[in-house]
A protein has these predicted regions:
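Bacterial N-terminal signal peptides that target proteins for export
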Residues: 1-8
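Cleavable N-terminal signal peptides
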Residues: 8-9, 19
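N-terminal signal peptide c-region/cleavage motif recognized by signal peptidases
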Residues: 14-18
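Flexible, solvent-exposed loop/hinge segments and secondary-structure transition points
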Residues: 21-175
Length: 175
């Protein structure tokens, strides 16, 4: 009886090891992280005299985490910024790439449903340690170029935090 119990335990243990080997560690964007992205984007917008802007932050699945609409921004900017962020997250690319592709004649892209695809400049993936954890989308600044610059500034806040955090961790390991 003891032998059967030992064998059963070994089988279960080996199954757990196999199951564990089939998973990967995935980074996730938190609400705190999304708020930092928005704060960085708003600070950049104010510093560069943007007339307004809506900043949306989504997770890697395109789900809204946080949104801020600066004073003076048109109401439709909220949905547009969410669409830009969602597009950047789901396609893992800046949305300017899609806008440029359409401008260059690939008009079939505009047939994609707008709930998943907003091919307008201003959506930027948020990358931490090589993993896309979400995206930021901006709409309502002075131009599409400024939308993108504000989004980049927001995304870079977390990238900078990750580098600082990694540096601090590495420094602690040194004897």
């Amino acid at each position: 009886m003891k032998l059967k119990t030992t064998i059963a335990a070994l089988i279960l243990l080996s199954a757990a090891v196999v199951a564990n080997a089939q998973t990967v560690e995935k980074k996730a964007l938190t609400l705190d992280g999304a708020k930092k992205v928005i704060a960085g984007a708003v600070a950049y917008a104010k510093k560069n005299n943007a007339p307004g802007g809506v900043i949306a932050v989504v997770d890697d699945g395109g789900n809204l985490i946080a949104l801020e609409r600066m004073d003076g921004t048109f109401a439709a900017g909220a949905n547009i910024s969410i669409g830009k962020a969602r597009t950047a997250a789901l396609f893992k690319r800046p949305t300017k790439m899609f806008e440029d592709t359409i401008k260059n004649g690939r008009t079939a892209l505009i047939a994609l449903p707008d709930t998943f695809f907003t091919p307008l400049q201003g959506g930027i993936p948020i990358v931490i340690d090589g993993q896309i954890v979400g995206a930021v989308g901006v709409s309502g600044a002075a131009s599409a170029q400024q939308d993108e610059e504000i989004a980049i500034a927001g995304a870079n806040v977390l990238a900078a935090d990750a580098k600082i955090s990694a540096l601090t961790t590495d420094e602690k390991r040194k004897p």
